[in-house]
Regions:
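Hydrophobic/aromatic-enriched cytosolic interaction surfaces used to assemble or bind macromolecules
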Residues: 1-170
């Protein structure tokens, strides 16, 4: 069991904003903890994008998108620079897989990579891979369900580039 020493000594997580980049515009939110398991919307802003800046989830014009992010950030009034961004659903491959529950963390990572190579139509060095253990399998206590997610590295790198160009830390 991990101990959250920051919470133990009264330190909170650093403020973070969420960014949604779509073909029509940028949406920015900042949520803050307002109680146990409760969040409050602290800031929100949206900014339109010129036609063609983002097409089918692909960032086509980094300058236009980063400028819109910077305008939304300024308009929101937030001071947070740490940003979390999602990927467009069409750019992400997800697959629920079953793995043995006795695997170590390192063994789990290796097994996920092995399994991913069966489901991802790209070389693994071309993708960003992530996974999350969902829980144990109902009728098989020796197994666990794992959600696997993968997207092309270039898609992630484009989103990181626009956030950094806007002065944020993705």
């Amino acid at each position: 069991m991990a101990i959250d020493f920051g919470a133990l000594f009264g330190r909170k997580n650093p403020p973070m904003i969420g960014l949604d980049i779509s073909s029509s515009g940028i949406k920015l939110v900042e949520l803050v903890e307002s109680g146990k398991n409760e969040l409050r919307l602290e800031c929100y802003a949206s900014e339109p994008l010129p036609r063609g800046a983002v097409v089918d989830g692909n960032i086509e014009n980094i300058d236009q998108v980063s400028d819109a992010i910077a305008r939304a950030w300024k308009k929101s009034g937030t001071r947070a620079k740490l940003a979390a961004m999602g990927m467009p659903p069409a750019s992400v491959i997800t697959k629920k897989i079953i793995l043995p529950s006795h695997l170590s963390e390192e063994g789990l990572e290796l097994q996920v990579e092995t399994e991913a190579s069966q489901y991802i139509p790209f070389a693994l060095d071309e993708v960003r891979l992530d996974f999350d253990v969902i829980g144990s399998v109902e009728n098989s206590p020796d197994d666990m369900e794992v959600m696997l997610a993968a997207t092309r590295k270039e898609k992630v790198e484009d989103r990181v580039a626009v956030a950094e160009a806007a002065g944020l830390k993705p």
